[in-house]
């Protein structure tokens, strides 16, 4: 069993960290665990989680966020080298409206391929359709005022 703080009984990722739920482990250190996603968007899609439970991006302590992000970078490099990926997406979903389904902070490391046989992920928006400058500036003001 792996040690973890803040574990919840109903969190599948806490179970994976504790060793009570099976997974295909890729890498582990004192703070993080990386394992294969069971519903992959591409060949080699995996998840990186902090061992300490945090619900989402708004909840995670800065030290766990930094460690998880650095582990994801290391995994992304290995995916490109080891799997021959052409690129990688790093994804976090925070909250139900953002498609979060497991409420334990995690980063998806999704290797991307030019070969559609290895990659079923599609962007949920159309790039190349920028908003008007006034709308962008207004959103910047609203977010900045909330900092």
Task: Explain the meaning of each model-derived region.
Residues 1-147:
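HIT superfamily nucleotide-processing domains
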């Amino acid at each position: 069993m792996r040690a973890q703080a803040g574990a919840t009984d109903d969190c599948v990722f806490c179970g994976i960290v504790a060793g009570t739920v099976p997974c295909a482990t890729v890498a582990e250190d004192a703070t993080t665990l990386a394992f294969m996603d069971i519903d992959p968007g591409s060949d080699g899609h995996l998840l990186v989680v902090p061992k300490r439970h945090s619900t989402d991006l708004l909840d995670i302590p800065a030290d766990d966020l930094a460690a998880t992000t650095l582990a994801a970078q290391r995994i992304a490099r290995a995916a490109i080298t080891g799997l021959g990926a052409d690129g990688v997406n790093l994804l976090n979903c925070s909250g139900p409206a953002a498609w979060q389904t497991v409420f334990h902070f995690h980063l998806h490391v999704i290797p991307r391929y030019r070969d559609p046989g290895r990659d079923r992920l599609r962007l949920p928006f159309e790039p190349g359709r920028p908003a008007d400058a006034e709308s962008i500036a207004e959103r910047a003001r609203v977010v900045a005022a909330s900092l």
